[in-house]
Amino acid sequence: MLVGACGLYSLHPFPRYRALSYSRSTLPEVIIPGPEGRLEGRFAPAPRPRAPVAMILHPHPNAGGTMNNRIVQELYKTFQRRGFATLRFNFRGVGKSQGTFDNGIGELSDAASALDWVQSFHPEASTTWIAGVSFGAWIGMQLLMRRPEIRGFISVAPPANMYDFTFLAPCPSSGIIIQGEGDEVVTPGAVQKLVDKLRTQKHITIHHDTIPHANHFFEHEMDQLMRSVDNYLDMRLDPNSPIR
């Protein structure tokens, strides 16, 4: 059953992410003006003014999710390698970011402010992408509905059994949803229902990859996860791609 944001954490507590996070990045820290004060981030500028923009959103703050989450860092690196102006940041109350957890409402505002910030450095960006992991995938999909410049998304383990995704009516952009077959937190069946619903909509194409044996953290299947991401980006970023 889908539930609203306020009831998520008490009904469906996430496992802790902290043990699966990398150590602090050596990239320069950036401070972004957010709705409740500063937001801590890491930013990789692009080599050219019209380069595309990408932003990656981390898992649930109350479960130890941060911008140093392993999957977040891998997504960050793959966009950076492709020449994107790439940002990852901590939601309010995480790390050096000011504020307190706001059940998704404030976090969506954080994401909007962060995207404004990165776009200010690349106002002529050719395209914008959003990627999110678990809770971050839910926030990212909401941001997608509010920002028409977002042309693609990567959603890893979107918590379709915990949060209401009916706001995607219609979903304005094509993207990929990636799920672990052995995910003990986000049930594959709930994600499949979300995919099936999105695929009934016109003018978008939804890819869906299921990674065999992978749990919610993809701790033993990171290579397979990133291969799925890279294959999708190869296809979407090809000038001859049928998906725009």
Predicted regions and their residues:
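Alpha/beta-hydrolase active-site loop
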Residues: 101-121
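Gly/Ala-rich beta-loop-alpha elbow adjacent to hydrolase catalytic centers
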Residues: 132-140
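N-terminal cap/lid segment of alpha/beta-hydrolase-fold proteins
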Residues: 11-49
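Catalytic histidine neighborhood in serine/cysteine hydrolases
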Residues: 198-217
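Conserved alpha/beta-hydrolase "acid-adjacent" motif
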Residues: 184-190
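Short beta-strand/loop motif that positions the catalytic acidic residue
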Residues: 171, 177-179, 183
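Alpha/beta-hydrolase fold nucleophile elbow
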Residues: 122-133
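Short, surface-exposed "cap/lid" segments of acyl-processing enzymes
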Residues: 47-84, 88
